[in-house]
Amino acid sequence: MPYSVTTGLVGNQQLALFGLPDTTSRQQPGLIVEAVDNYWGGGEFIYCRANGSIRQNGLVVITPTTASGAWRYDCTEVPNTANLGRMLGVATTVATSGQFIWVQISGITPVNCQASVAADTTFGIAAAGQGGANSAGKQVLNARIIAAGATTVAKASCTGNSGTNRLVIPNADGWFCGVYLSGTGIAAATTVTDIDPSGTVVTLSANMTAAVNGTVTATYNNATVYYNVAHLNRPFAQGAIT
């Protein structure tokens, strides 16, 4: 299910680990809301304008900048640089420059990473827009991995027709856009590209090769991209260490 905003905001852009970015600002960038999801729990999200291409669940830097005589909050993929000392967040969707998205700054979320990181450990910036193993000067502070990128979440009683890309599932708990799927009738390298607001229908990146009537498994990595699950509390990149 999508996150439900709990702070009284009316008419908000869909706030979820799935859905689409928007080319029109629906709120003032910089707005922070609290929201809750039945599976991922509560969290905080800041409304930002993408100032470059951002990958799914990418690690981003949040930067206030002036535009048209007012302050605006922009986000870009975090550079692979030590001692940044900058505010970070996790993008809830893929975006390109000029689009508006929600960025998670507290709560539990998958983070796009270069490698699997063990649960209950710190992590750091490993590449532009990606987390990974911690290293000197690159730690993501106020954040910790709570589930490794080797996590799998299987759903029984899934159904879908051969040649289509719409899969009906019992619920979307533990699934998110970008997660890798496998099972009878699921094409190789298939990912989830969208999840219906009901949480019971997902759109796949490839058509099913045969009718699906059974278990489909989501894996949090494809041996190249790893979605480690992190607990965030307004994270920031490590600053000077000398």
Task: Say what each PLM segment does.
Residues 1-2, 54, 60, 90, ...:
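Generic hydrophobic secondary-structure signal
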Residues 2-153, 219-242:
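Glycine-anchored, exposed beta-strand/edge motif detector
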Residues 83-84, 95, 151-231, 241:
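Small/polar beta-strand repeat architecture
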